[in-house]
């Protein structure tokens, strides 16, 4: 009899504990969040700027996204590739010229474009109107790369009147690229600037 009572107590205890855990939220379960609207982003002093919307820390490193603003006739980054990052661009305003390999895509407002990992790519604004787009990143905290580049390295360059060729700046940028698996091809940039009359 005591054995039966022990078994019943054990089973009931296990079921109660399991039922209690049904409503517990493990730390890796995503929580809902809301992001209110914000005024459109304006290009910064160098003709580009970024603003983070969704952080990778909010999505267990599954997803993040930023808004980018590019002034008219402005070149984006040098051609580059990502070792492990796929990017999706959604254009909010204007037209993004996106180079992947040797093909150029003209992505108008409302259009999407995928830039897969391992392919050399860049973008620019060839028009006389502002360009704004959202960049979506998967399985990498790439918003942190951009925040460090735009809001720390570029900010320090402006304060100290330095260029990317300054040894201190070049070292910081190379370390940042290495940390995030980015390979730059700066020697390919000027030909694009010259061909499309960009800044």
Regions found by a protein language model. Give the residues of each.
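Short, conserved beta-strand element in jelly-roll/cupin
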Residues: 67-71, 81-98, 136-137
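Ligand-binding loop in jelly-roll beta-barrel domains
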Residues: 117-144
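Acidic/histidine-enriched, glycine/proline-rich intrinsically disordered or flexible terminal extensions
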Residues: 152-199
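A short glycine-rich, His/Asp/Glu-containing loop-to-beta-strand
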Residues: 42-79, 85-86
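Short acidic-glycine-tyrosine-enriched beta hairpin
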Residues: 102-117
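C-terminal segment of N-terminal export signals and the immediately downstream linker at the start
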Residues: 21-53, 199
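Tight coil/turn sites that cap or link beta-strands
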Residues: 71-75, 110, 118
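N-terminal secretory signal peptides and thylakoid transit peptides that target proteins
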Residues: 1-14
